[in-house]
Each structure stands twice: as C-alpha cells, then as structure tokens.
Amino acid sequence: MPRAPPSGPTTAPGREDDARGLRKRSRRPGLGEAGGCGPEAEGLEESRQKRRMVARASGREEVESDKSAKEKRKVTEASSDDPQPGIDLVRKESLTSSESFPTVECSEFQSMAFLQSLGKERLVEGIKRRIRIKKCKSLESPALKMTENKATQNSKVEFQDELYKNTLKYSCNSLSPGVENNSVLKLHDCSCLSHSKDCNDENNLAYKPDGGCMHVPENSSKSKKENPRSLIDKTDPSNIPQLLQTEENVMRVSQLLLEENDSYLSKNNGLFSCLQSEKTKHSIEESSIGRKSRKRMKVSEKGNGMVIEMKFSNMCNKSELMLQGNQTGADGKETEILEAKKSSLKVLRKVNNNTLSPMDPLLSLPETGKKTSPEHCANAVFQKALEQLSKEETKNVSQPLGCTSMDPPEDYFKSMKNSLVKSLSDCFPIEKRSSRESLKNEAEESKYSCQRTIPMTGKRTWPCYSCARISAQCWKKASLPQSSRQDDFLKHQMNQTHLTDSKLMLQSSVTETNSASSSIEKLDSNLNCLPSVSTVEPTSVVIKEPIVNDDEKMKSEELSRSASEVVSNTTEDTSLTNMTHNLTGSKKKDRGNLTKLNLTVASQDGQEANNSTSKTVHRKACITKQALVVPDLVKILNTGRLTNFKIPLLKNKTEKRKEINAKSSEREVYSPLELLDSVSGAEVRQSRTKENAVTVTSGPQSLSIQRSVIPVQASSDSFCSKNSCIIAPSFLKQGNNKQPSNHISASGRIISNNAAGSLTVENNTFSCDPGCIEKNPTFYSNEQEPFKAVSSEVSGRKMTENFSEIKVGFPDILKAYEDDVLLIDVIQDDPDLFGVSNEGELSFPSEVPMISQEPNVAEEHQSTDSKHMELPDKKEPSNALRELPVPDPGSMKSEICASLSAASEIKHDSKDANISLGEVTHETSSNEKPRGLSEQTKSSDLDEKCRFSDKVAIREEKETISEVCRRDSKNTEIMVGECHLAALVSKPLCLPVPLPPLNLNAHQEDTLLNPQMNDFRLPGKHSVLKLQNPEICEIFKREKNVGVFQKPLGLMIPHRYCKFHFNTLRGCERSQCKFGHVPEQGDEKVCMDVFKKYISINELCLLQRAANMFMEYYRKFLPGIHFDLQVLNDLLSSLLKHCLLKEVFQVMNLCIMIKMLPALKILLKIFEYVATMKLRNAVPALINIFCKLLEAGMVLDPEHFNYIVKLLYQVQASKQEITAVLEMKSRLHMRQFKKNWKCDLEAALNEIEHCKEKGDWTKLGNVYLNIKMSCEKFADFQRFCACIAETLTKDCKEERPGVPFCEFAETVSKDLQNSEVDKTLLGRIGISAMYFYHKLLQWSKGRKVLDKLYELKIHFTSLKGLIGPEKLAPRCQIVNIAAEIFLKSGSLDGAIWVLRESEWIINTPVWPCDRLDVLNRHNLLCTIAHEILAKSLYRQTFEVLQNLPGFQNSQETVEVSQYSLLFNKLLDACIESNSLGMSSSVAEFMISKSIPIDFSFLRRLITSLGRSCLWLKARAHYKSALSLGCYPPLEGNLYRKLLLIPSYLSEIEMLLAIEIFLVSNASSIQSPGTSTQMLQIVLKRSEENKSRSKDDYQAAVERLITAARISDPKLFIKHMTVNVNKEQVYSLEQCSALKWLKENMKWAGKVWLFNNH
C-alpha cells in the first residue's frame, strides 16, 4: 500500500513550513497561556494567508471535487453495498488527484478502492509513513501544555485560514481556518482531500498518518476497491501538488500537533489524551477549579468546534455539494464497506471526500500535525483492529460498540481520528497514545462512553446499561475500569443505538453502512469545506470505528453517512446546509451519511473521552475553548440528528434516571469529560430517539459524533442537547487535552481542529451561515479571521467576541466557562422536570448570534462533565442555557432538551448550528426527519441569538431556521413546530429563568439528563422519538423550545389519558401510546372541556384534533348530559373559519346521526363559504347534508330557502341541486303543517275556509298534504277531503277565471310522495267539481276539471264523487256528464275519450244504471254521431253507432231498428265518399243486426265494389241482397237454360247473375250430350222501363255486352231475336261458357251454390 508521495504543488512545502511555523508559534502561546491569544493572532494571520492559498487551490479543487464527488457517489453506492475490511488511509492516499478527494467524500471505501485502482497506494503509504513518523515524533515529545496546544491551534488556525482561502479556490466549499488541524489538511484539500479525509492519498499525506493511517489499512483497501473509478475520476492531478504541499504543511503542523498531542496522549490515554493533556495542564493550573476548568476548556473547545463547524459548514456547503454528489453514489457501497471496516473506512472515505473540498485539506493539515505519530501507531493497530473489529462487528452487531470495537481499536481509533472512518473509540484513543494504549483507553472509554453511538442492531430496545439509561454509570470512569466502563458504555450506546433505529444504526453503522459512508463522505465534503471539519473527521472516524466494531459495520457505515451528514450539516449548519442543498443530487444520502457519521464520531469521541479521561481527541487537542465551541456546534448537529433516533427511553427510565441522578451527583468528582460523556450519551440517546442518524451511540461516542455532527447540528437545538451531551464528555476530556477540535472535526470537521484550529474553524463556521456556506466559500475565508479570533479567544477568552463578529459568538458560554459556570438548557415548562408550568415559552434574545450559543453549550457541557452536580450551579449561565433552550423550536422538533445542560447547550448550540447548520440542517432534516434538523437549526439559531449580539449571525440563523422550517414543514410532525420555530426565530432568544437543577423527575432526567448524564433525549427530532416517558419529555421540551408548542394548554386531564395528546399543541407523537387519546364513555365532560380549550386557542392543529376527537367519541357513544350544543356550534364555526370544510362536513354528518343538529346560522355560513369560495365540487355534499338536516327536523323559513337558492345560483349549482332545495322547502312546509295540524280537523277546516275566502287554492293543497301526512285514520282524511270538495264546489263565482280544483290538484300533484290514494281522492274531488260545473252549465270550467284529471292521468270514470248525488251516481251517468261537458264545450274527441275510457259501458250487472241514463246515453251518442258524421268521420260515427243502447247485451230492451236511419245515412255517406271498406262494414253490420237497409244503397255498394274489382265483397253483398229480395228470384229458369236479367241492373250485377247462371247449368254445359242446347239470356224490360225511352233499354243492352266482356275469361253472346215483349234475346256461346267454368268453377261453386248464412 505505501506509495511515494505524489509531487504536490510547489506551494505545498511552503504551506508545510507555514504549518510548522504555526505549530511552533501555537505551542509557545499555548504553553504560555491557556488562552493562547497572542499566538493565536499570529496564527490567524498566517492561517488566513494559507487559507487564501488554499482558497485559490480550492477554487480549482472545487470543480474537480464536484466531478469526483459525482463519481464518488457512484463508486460509493457500489462500494457501500459490500463492506470490506478496513482500508488504510494510505490506500486512500492513492487519490493522487483532487478527484480522488471527491471520491473519498462519496465514500471512504470507494475512495480507498479508487486509490487502489489508481495504484497510488505507495503515495498513501508514504504519506502514512510521514504522518506516522511525525506522530512518533510528536509522541516522543512528552506532552504539550494546553497553552502550547492552543498556540499551536492558533497558529494552525491562522495557517488554516490561509489554507482555507486557498482551499476555497481549490474546492467549492472550503472550511474556514477555524480548524487548525484541518487547516493543514486543507492545504492538501486544496489539491485533494485534506488530512481530514484519509482517503485523499495526495492531500492527506500528512493527515492520513494522523487520522486515517490506522484506519486506512482496512478501509483503504476496500475503499480503493470500491471507489477506484470514482477516485480516479475525482482525483485531479492538479490537486496532487497542492495536496503534497498541503500534506507537507500538514505533516509539519501535525508534527507540532502530534508532539503536543503526544505529550497529552502520554498523559491521557485514549480520547482524553488530547483533551486531558490540555485539561491536565489546565487543571494543574486550575487544580482548584478541577472540573470547572475542564468544562471551560470543553466549552471553549466546543465553541471553537462550533465555529469550526460553522465555517466548515460554509466551506463544506460547496465542497460538500460536490462531495455529496459523490457521496450519494458511494453511500450504498460505503455502508457495507464501513460495516466491514468499522466506520474507519467511513472516516477515510469522508476524508477523501473532504480532501476534494478545501475543508478537507485544511482539516487534514492540522490533524495531521497533531495526530501524526499516534496515528501511525494507531494505523498499524488500527488495521488489525479494523480487521478484528470488522469481524467482531459482524458478530457483535448487537453488542455495544465500545465493548467490541473500542478496546482493540484504540490505536485504530487514533488513526481513525485522522480519518473519519475510525470508530468512535478509535478516535479517542488515537489522540496521542500508542495504538495499543489507545485501544485500551478506548475500550475503557467505551465503557463509560454512550453506547448509542455504537453500531445499532436495529432493535428498539436498549439494554438497561445503555448510555441512554445509565449515562451516569457511563460517567463513572473511576468506579469502573475505563475499558470495562467504556465497553459498558458502548453497550449502552449500542442499546441506545438499537433504540435509535436506523439513525443510531449510523453509529452502529453495521446496518446503515451506506448511510454511514454517505455521512462520512458528506462529512468529508464538510471537512473539505471547513478546515476544522477535517479535524473532526479523524475524531468522527475514531468514533465510527467502535461503531463498526459491533453492529457497526453495517451501522457504522450508516453512521458514517449520517455522521458525515451530520458533520456536513453541522459544520454547514449555516454553510453545510447550503452545501447540502448544492449537493442536492447526493444531498439526501449525504445528509443521512453525514448525520450518521457525525453521530458515530460524536459517540466515538464520547467513548474516547470515557475510555481515557486523560486522553484527548487528537484533533481535539486544539484549544479547550475551541473544542468547547465546536462541541456546541456538535451538539447542535447532534441534536438535529438525534431527532432521527428513536430510542425507547421509557424503558427502565425511572431506574436509569435514578442511576443517572446518583451518578451525576457522584460524577462531580469525576472529570468533566466523563460528565460530558454521560450527558452526551444521554443526549445521544435522545438524539437517536429523535434522530437515528444524528444521535451517535453513546455519550463519548456521541461526543465524537457531535464533532462531525456539530456543524450540521449547530443549526438546530438538537445539536445543543445532543452535542452538549456528546461534546461535553469528549470536550471536557478534550478540553483538558485541548483536542476537542478533533472531536468537533469528527462531528463537523470544525471540531476536529478545535484543539488547534477549532476556534478558527468555528469562527469560519459561525461566520458561514447556512446560506453563506452554501453560497460563498469565500465567506469562510472572511469568517476565518473571526474564527482565528475566536480560536485565539478560545485560548484567550476572545472566542465570544470573535464569534459575535462571526455571527456565531459564544459570549455567554465562554463567560460561563471562564466564570466556571455550568450552563444548563432546561425547558421550564417541561412537566417531567418541573411539572406542568406555564413557562413553556422562552424569551429568546435575538441579539445573541446563533453560533455563540454553541460555544456556551460546549462550556456548559464541559462544566457539566466536570461537575455532574454543578449543573444546577451553572444555572446562573442559564441565560446561555436558556438561550440554548431558546432553540426550543429546534428543541421541539429534536427534543434537544433531553438533558438539562444538554438542553441548554442544545438550545445555544442549536442556534449556532442554525448558523452553521442552518443549511446543514436542511440536509440533515431531509435525510433525517426534518423536524430534528429544524429543531437543531432553530435551537442553535435561538442560542446564537441569546449568546451573541451579532445580528448577522441571527439573520443567518433565521435563514437557517426558515430553511429548516420549510424542510420541517414538509414533515407533518414538524409542521406546527416549524411555524412556531419561525416565530421564535423572529423573537429574541433569551431564557431568563435559570435552569432547574438536573435532579428532576426520573423521566425528566432521562429526557433532560444533566449535562453530566449521557442520556441524549434532547436530540433534535422528538417526533421521531417514540419514547415512552422520555419521548413525552422531549415533546414537552420541543414544545417549550418552540414556545407555545411546549406550553401546556392548562387542561385538567385524567391520568389515564395522554396529556401530550390532550394538553399540548403538538400532541402526542409516539407511535404507540399507552395512554388514551380518545375520552372514554362517561368522560363527555372531558370532551367538552377539551373542545372549549381548543376552540379558545383557535389553532388549526387543535381544531383538527378536536374534530377528530369529536368524530371518534360520538361514533362510539351517544351524547350525554354534558353535551353542549353551543360548543358544537363554536367548533363548526372555528373549523369553517380555518377552511376545514372536510372536517365540517364530517362533523355535520355525525351530528345528524346522533340527532344533535347545529344552529341554522352555521348551515347558512357553510353555504355562504361555499358560494364565496366558488367550491362547486362541495355543493353535492352540502346539499346532501342540507336535506338530511331538514329531514332530521331543522326548520327553515322561506326566506332562508330563497337565500340558499340564491347562493347556489352564485356557485352555479345544477338545476337538480336547486330543485332538491325547493323540494325540501315544500316538504318542510308539510312538516310544519303536520306539526301544527296533527289530526286537528277543526283547525284544518278553518284553514280551508280561510283559503276559500282568500281564494288561495294552492295553500289549500298544502293543507291537504299536511293533513294527509298527519292524519292517522283514513276516514278522517276522507272527511277532510269531502270538506275540500265542498269548498271547491260551493260558492264559486263565475267571474273568477280560475278553477279552484285545478290549482288545488296542481299543488297536491307536486308531492313526491303522491300515491294512487291521492289520485283517487283527487279524482273523486274532481267528479264533484265536474258535477258542480255541469249543474251550473259551466262547460268550460267543467272541461278544465276534466282536462286536469286527464293530465294527471286520473281514471275518474270508474270513480264516484265525494259529496252530493255524485257520491251515488252510476258510472253511466258520470260518463254521460263528462261526455256532455266535452260535447258542450266543443270537444268531440274529449267526449269520445270519456266514452272510450268508460269502455262504452251503459248498463251492466257490475255497473247498473237507470233507464234514464240509457236514454241519455242514446241521445248523447246520437248527437255525437250526427256531429261526427257531419265531419265525415265515418269510422268514429260507426263506432258511436255500434255502442248505441241495445247492441251491447240482450238485457237492453231497446229496438235497434230505430237506428236504421242513422246507419243508412252513414252507409250512403260512405258510398258517396267511396269509402267502400267502411260502407261494406256498415252494410254487414246492418244486415247482421237486422237493421233495415236501403236496397239502392246496397246495389250501389255492390256495383261500386265490382267496379273496384272487390269481387269477393261484391259477390257477398250480391248474395246477401239476393236473399233479402233485392233481386227477383231466378225461379226455375236455371234448369231451362234461360236467364232473365232486369234491364235496370248494372253490368256488375248482370255479370254476377250470369255467373250464377253458368254455375247452375254447369253440369249440362259440361256434358257432351247437350252440345245442341243453347243458353239464352233475355234482357227483360221492367214496367218501369216501359215508360222510359228506348235509350235506357239500349244502355241496358250495352251493359249486358260489357258484363260479358269483363268476365274472365270472356264470354261471348250473340243476339238471337226479340221476343214478343220486344225484349232482346241473346245466346251464350257454348265454348266460352265451357272455358269459363273450367277456370272458375272451383270458387264459383262455393260462392254461389252454398248458402253462407
């Protein structure tokens, strides 16, 4: 693997020299004074210069890093799938080009793999060797004083500033020079990933030995394997020289730092080596102060880390954009690789990613300087440890991270520190001890550190010994062996991690290897952006390594992703968030990765701190104040991320609280680092609970995680709580060792350089708002100076002012630290802590910048760690703490207030995180639950406001908060909180009330564990936390952080009900709540009280909850005595005001079901609202509800109906809908009448008379309908109808044009429920009216009545009247009257219709009638027949004549012969009109009925029929006429062969006579013997014809001849002679006759020979 270091840019050596000079200068002032202000100033200047150089380099590197980041993402995704054993950062050094750094960002493993593919392992190994050599040298140096460290940090900070500037040029996002170690790395990062990313082979030459050498062995190989492509793509030869230069500078700086760290490592084994080295010296100087000094150092360190993170976030935003893009692809593979590599690879990967960005170079340089020698040792050990850990992690995924991975990987962690890939424990021990010592220390620290950060098995249950449950126990380092305690603590963290779920799994990183890798990549990108971030990376790497050890392989990768995501978010809280947005493509994965990585780093740092109280994180070896500042940022980051963790803190909560309380009290004796570790562990738990990714595993682990997370979480309250707890332990420890920067670098990469350059980084970080970071890498450079000042302040108390300048000042926290005050952030309204109180809202001074709170948080955590029981004492700085709570908006979402000090710190840190993490929070919140990040951002934002007067920081914080709020708003859980958060942002963030003592309710302690306690329930996303009691506490905390949300509503709720659901604005956010959310039967009064309260508050969420509660309760139970209709009306009105129309409809429908109708005004308001808003789609549902309400008994006046119809027209309702309303109007009138006139016939009769007087027949119809519905007895109703009939038939004046019956019938007929009974009654009333008008001879009115009956299809002919004679009238009479009315009114059709309707019935057994009625019918029919015949309506006339009396049945004794005239007249008319068919029918009917028929008409008919060729009918009628005597009989002439034909016959008649003659003589004609005989025809003259002229007879002759011709076949006749009577005699030719017979004999014989009658 070792490779020759690539020839770096020409500037690299110079930079190294500068770094070395910076180291020297930093050592001097650091030794001279704790603050190191003087040297810091110089360091700041130099660092600024170097930053400029780095910025220039970064500008170029950014472009490359972007490309490489994209490639890395791909490689990372591929690599993350398959976890590989640890790969050396040396392998990552194969990233000779700047693109390799982006690849590292994407994933350590990918970058490692890429490095391998590049074949640049030799360069990496060479770098490692250099770093190791430097580490050895630094280790050889006995110990550096805190002042030396601070000075070195200051110098590094200055150098980093310059590097940062240069880095900005090289990379899109360059971290501010706040991180001293990162500054050195940043030089490399300009060309490649700085030391902060071990994956950067070229850039991290110095750094890789520091942070990633040990870790690289396992991870580098894998990352190289996985990321060869991405690394190659991303590695940019242009960056190589810069990386070399940076590496050289880093090596120089790292040598100085390592020397200092070596002294500390020798003093402090494990994570505390750096911090405790500072602490030891500082504590030696302030031995009387003891823990307070440690706390101060941690606070300063946290502040520096915060600042670094802030600047990192700014720088990282750009670089991270590139890195995240790469990280996104690399996340998937990184996760698996990290799992196998125990998150050390994650760190490396992130380091590589960071190398791509300017942040990484800056970070890598300082870290390399500090941790080179220890990490060389650690690398060897770490490689082995990684292998072992990878195996152990695979086996012990469920085991506490610290237990398995912490012990062996201490050295490994040391190397991991330099590379974020290292596990948490590895990070801590890496500081300056040998690999073995570090591993041991880490094992011990892991026992005491919060196990949450440790790899998560994915289980929700945490062992009772987990940090979440026994953070106090974790703190007891003295009581337990450090290794064992660390193991236990890691176990707890592991448990917590399991509780934390996927995000805690980030710490465990086994399950979430991908996310961890992404996190690391993001972290790396953050590191690239922020110099301090690189420092954080090593720490986070160390933290992640333990995570990888257990379940962490999978989860460590996840943690890496989350941690790096957190780091990016944290560092970029202001800047990183922007970076994250820039890295939109890989933003989500990167965010998750960063968060997880940060979490892992934080937890690792916490573990490291626990393992070796004396140990200080290598990268945290920076100034104590810087480390403290960074811890705040880390807290903020962690807080935001912790929200993602879901830890059931309720389990064994009471016992654990007690233990934590007792331990916290006992831990006053313990080092502040332990306390911080414990607190961080608790906070990490909460963070996990809320932010799986954010919360690392344990207090110590979360500490390191916080480093990486700090930049991200700095913008959220959750960061304060989480980081406060996480950072507190490691920073207290680191504060002594002045290595909190490492821790911060792990979490945010700002912290990593906290020791030497964390302040600078923090300044940059703080100066970089989320927007700034994202938007402006130069902003980092601008803020690098403030960071430098901050770093100097951290070393010399100027941090606060510088942070103010940076907009992230930490005045209160620094003061508190200086004053040895423990700042505690507590929610005054937290019922778990203080019971339900009305102090939920906290005033937040907008003056304090967000970042300033982070340093305070760091100080608070340090003080908390140093003095577990001093948390109450440090309530004096509670303003800062409250400022931290001020991020309550963030806290609400992230539940940052899990621990008191953590809560306060979280709030302050949240503000800080808001500045640096604002944008990071967006990333984190998008990857995690937006609520947590937003909470982090808000809390950090609020804290900054409280802490710093810098308004710019506040603005940035607000921007961050607004961004976070927007993200959160996307999440329903955070929606309400976001609004309040925005409000809080606008408000000043100041918590005037001192925080109550940490000793609170067990539940409260679990949630808000004292900063001493490691319980991280404060982490950002309380909504994510599904904790039982802790979750409730977190909810209250969040609500309090948000102000109104956390404030109880003041309801007195029975204990069996969930007070959060009923008594808070946010409601219960637990997935499964054991308390009731719906009142039980008998608690209707509770319902009403809740409704009243919610209505009075008039909040949208509460009104929705009230509506749902109403629906759920009254679906089960009926309204009782406590039901208040006014409350229902108020609820509906409030819902309508908030445009909750759906809920309004639901409640209305349920009200109808339970028969509790709302007020009419509510219904009208709903119609008005729908009409005003033009909600056409809502009209059908509204009409449905309207109809149901009316049917249920609601009464509306006619004007109300008219108004509703008007509104419906406005909304363009359909005709059907409007008709439905009108129908309901009529039905309502009926109901009203029914209600007023129930069976009250007397009143009804009076009403009838009243209607009669007024002539209001429509109203009479309504009266009828109402009576019909109300009457129970039909007889009574008939009486009433008789009264109506009388009214309609009496006293009617002719002058009135209208017919009362018609109006009345029209009204009644409109009733939809009209039945046959109604029709019958109307028909009977109509008959009475008809009789009435018939008597009055008012034919027109009578006809109107008949027309109405016809229109209504009422068959009145079968009915009888209701009153008078018509009541007994026969049917014939009724029909006669009706027909007569029609006839008199001129309607023959009407008359015929009536007759037909009655079936012409006159007198039948069923319908008997009088003779007078029959006579009347005869006369009526005759009259009708004459009128119809006059109109030539022969068929109708014949129909009428056929139905004359006497024709229907035999009972009628009428003589039909009297109808002869009528029929003959009809027959004549038909013949005249040539209606042969009708004529034939009439003739047949007359013949059949024996009606005398006129022969002339009959003969005419026969002739007409024949001429019309209707021979059949002609022959039939001729035969009938012959039988009737119309023709003379043939007598006997037939057989004499003589035919006598009268001359008056027509030719048709003559032919018919000839046919009969032929048929009669057929036998003789056809016989052969008779051929001699002749057939003679005599045209006989009649006597009448005698007197006539000859012409008539001659015409008869012609007719005869014609008759013979028309025959078929023709007949031939010959004139023979004239007889005596002068009659012509003709002979019929035999042949023609024979022929005719042959053809016609068949039918002719039938017709003529047989009688058909």
Curated annotation (Swiss-Prot):
Q: What is this protein called?
A: Protein TOPAZ1
Name a biological process GO annotation. Answer: apoptotic process
Pfam families named in the record: Asp_Glu_race_2
Compartments where located: Cytoplasm, Cytosol
InterPro entries, alphabetically? TOPAZ1 (IPR038952), TOPAZ1_dom (IPR029435)
- Domain of life, per the record? Eukaryota
Renumbered to this chain, region (Disordered) spans 1-88, 212-238, 553-591, 855-893, 919-942
The UniProt entry lists the main location of this chain as: cytoplasm
Gene Ontology cellular-component terms for this entry are: cytosol
Q: Record keywords: Cytoplasm included?
A: yes
Function, as annotated: Important for normal spermatogenesis and male fertility. Specifically required for progression to the post-meiotic stages of spermatocyte development. Seems to be necessary for normal expression levels of a number of testis-expressed gene transcripts, although its role in this process is unclear.
Locate the compositionally biased regions of type Basic and acidic residues: 58-69, 221-236, 858-877, 920-942
Residue ranges annotated as compositionally biased, kind Polar residues, are 561-585
